[in-house]
Amino acid sequence: MIYKVFYQETKERSPRREKTRALYLEIEAANELEGRIQARKLIEENTPYNIEFIELLSDKHLEYEKESGTFELTEF
């Protein structure tokens, strides 16, 4: 499953929509909730990011992300 994670680069400042960034993770999980938990754990262990939202991408959404040119899987 591919998850899109929206985040702020630091926890020091209050979140601002204009500064929101995204990364993509491939997670092997039994269900969506387990995948979100694993994604959050991976990011918290490997980055100082402030996570805003974690979204499971549908097949159509994934195709759109790939076509937009911003899609790149992040590995830790």
Curated annotation (Swiss-Prot):
Alphabetically, the GO molecular function entries are: DNA binding; DNA-directed RNA polymerase activity
Disulphide bond pairs: none
Q: What is its EC number?
A: 2.7.7.6
The answer, when asked if Transferase is one of the entry's keywords, is: yes
Kindly state one GO CC term assigned in the UniProt record. DNA-directed RNA polymerase complex
Q: Name one Pfam family in it.
A: RpoY
Write out the similarity annotation: Belongs to the RNA polymerase subunit epsilon family.
- What is the annotated quaternary arrangement, including any partners? RNAP is composed of a core of 2 alpha, a beta and a beta' subunit. The core is associated with a delta subunit, and at least one of epsilon or omega. When a sigma factor is associated with the core the holoenzyme is formed, which can initiate transcription.
Q: What does this protein do?
A: A non-essential component of RNA polymerase (RNAP).
| Protein name per the record | DNA-directed RNA polymerase subunit epsilon
What organism, scientifically named, is this protein from? Streptococcus sanguinis (strain SK36)
What lineage does UniProt assign to this protein's organism? Answer: Bacteria, Bacillati, Bacillota, Bacilli, Lactobacillales
- The gene from which this protein is expressed is rpoY
